[in-house]
Amino acid sequence: MAKNTNITTVADNRKARFSYEVIDTLEAGLVLSGTEVKSLREGHANIQESYAAVEGGEIWLINSHIPEYFAGNRFNHEPRRRRKLLLSKKEMARLAQAVEREGMTMVPLKLYFNERGIAKLLLAIARGKKLHDKRETLKQRDWSREQARLLKERG
């Protein structure tokens, strides 16, 4: 089987960039079973309601949905199981500190396969936006669309 030379996005959490102010991002590996990888390769996953949490000195991806593989029979996985994230000790300590001391949240932004065909998760350290911040984001987005439309009309 030929390896992919580009990054294949499986799931994207577009709502996270609207609801949170992203401070920093980092790439994490995932501990997956065989049927989970096969289901991801078919492009089936949902990380909209998922989040990451520190438990027992490890970081876990909670509430992500990877549906069962159709040909997985009795060896299929549980769709909403907790998945361990693979990070260095230094990265785990930095994330744990940000969550505990600074009141930040770990939010998954994107689930993808890298150039080597390995499933990765783009994890963000983020701070929740207030309602007025969300309104400001909407205003800026509408204004940029309006500017683009006006420039297009003028030629």
Curated annotation (Swiss-Prot):
Gene Ontology CC terms: cytosol
UniProt subcellular location: Cytoplasm
GO molecular function, one term: RNA binding
PROSITE patterns, per the entry: SSRP
Transmembrane segments: none
Residues making up the signal peptide according to the UniProt record: none
Keywords: Cytoplasm, RNA-binding
NCBIfam families: PRK05422.1, smpB
PANTHER family in UniProt: SSRA-BINDING PROTEIN, TMRNA-BINDING COMPONENT OF TRANS-TRANSLATION TAGGING COMPLEX
Its biological purpose: Required for rescue of stalled ribosomes mediated by trans-translation. Binds to transfer-messenger RNA (tmRNA), required for stable association of tmRNA with ribosomes. tmRNA and SmpB together mimic tRNA shape, replacing the anticodon stem-loop with SmpB. tmRNA is encoded by the ssrA gene; the 2 termini fold to resemble tRNA(Ala) and it encodes a 'tag peptide', a short internal open reading frame. During trans-translation Ala-aminoacylated tmRNA acts like a tRNA, entering the A-site of stalled ribosomes, displacing the stalled mRNA.
Similarity comment: family membership: Belongs to the SmpB family.
UniProt protein name: SsrA-binding protein
Native organism: Chelativorans sp. (strain BNC1)
Gene name tied to this protein: smpB
